[in-house]
UniProtKB/Swiss-Prot annotation:
Catalyzes the reversible adenylation of nicotinate mononucleotide (NaMN) to nicotinic acid adenine dinucleotide (NaAD). Belongs to the NadD family. Keywords: ATP-binding, NAD, Nucleotide-binding, Nucleotidyltransferase, Pyridine nucleotide biosynthesis, Transferase. The keyword ATP-binding applies. GO terms for molecular function: ATP binding; nicotinate-nucleotide adenylyltransferase activity. Residues 194-213 are annotated as: Disordered. Pfam families: CTP_transf_like (PF01467). This is Probable nicotinate-nucleotide adenylyltransferase. It catalyses: nicotinate beta-D-ribonucleotide + ATP + H(+) = deamido-NAD(+) + diphosphate. It comes from the Bacteria. Pathway: Cofactor biosynthesis; NAD(+) biosynthesis; deamido-NAD(+) from nicotinate D-ribonucleotide: step 1/1. Its EC number is 2.7.7.18.
Length: 213
């Protein structure tokens, strides 16, 4: 499951659990984005903070794990590189790449997007009622095998990372929107405030969007 996870929230966890059940997956690997390349419109917490929040959030589920492949690779994060690295580490596995369905709206702009469907099946998770828009996208999808892309509705995705960040900045509670350990980590590190508690996190900031590309 690829994403910025800034912060990871309960919607991500419910979505991962739902997809794992629907597709009978042995494991869901969460892959926090390293350095994104699209829509440099906002600051993002340091990669190490986002990685540690994801580890905290997923620790209690034996079916979940967290990978550092995008963070440790360095340079801009491209989904094609993520899939290549995961495939190299799991040569016998059938890969499913889980991401937000809204992110798939720009999939034709992703680097080498056609090749990615030979490496994994894609699962877009969305709020109920979401439809993949764009005739050019739908036309391109028709050229792919029927099971190349699936959309899964997850009611818990009404929670968003952007809302969690805004609430934290306004000193409003984020309890029950994100796992308890993540609430405590955000408070300890002073994330999403105008003056982070630790200058290193600020120095590590990069600009990003919600989902991996």
């Amino acid at each position: 499951m690829g994403g910025t996870f800034d912060p990871i929230h309960n919607g991500h966890l419910v979505a991962a659990s739902e997809v794992a059940d629907l597709f009978d997956l042995d494991e869901v690997v969460f892959v926090p984005t390293g350095e994104p390349w699209q829509k440099h419109h906002r600051r993002v917490s340091a990669a190490e903070d986002r990685y540690l929040m994801t580890v905290i959030a997923t620790a209690s589920n034996p079916r979940f794990s967290v990978s550092r492949v995008d963070i440790d690779r360095g340079g801009p994060t491209y989904t094609k590189d993520t899939l290549r690295d995961l495939r190299d580490l799991n040569t016998d596995a059938d890969l499913y790449f889980i991401t937000g369905a809204d992110a798939l709206g720009s999939i034709l702009s992703w680097q080498n997007w056609e090749d990615m469907f030979s490496m994994a099946k894609f699962v877009g998770v969305s709020r109920p009622g979401y439809e993949l828009d764009g005739k050019h996208i739908l036309d391109a999808m028709r050229e792919l095998p029927p099971d190349a892309l699936s959309l899964v509705e997850v009611p818990a995705l009404a929670i968003s990372s952007s809302d969690c960040r805004k609430r934290a900045e306004e000193q409003r509670p984020i309890w029950y929107l994100v796992p308890d350990g993540v609430v405590q980590y955000v408070a300890k590190r002073g994330l999403y405030t105008r003056k982070p508690n630790n200058g290193e996190a600020k120095d590590g900031d990069v600009k990003d969007e919600e989902a991996v590309r």
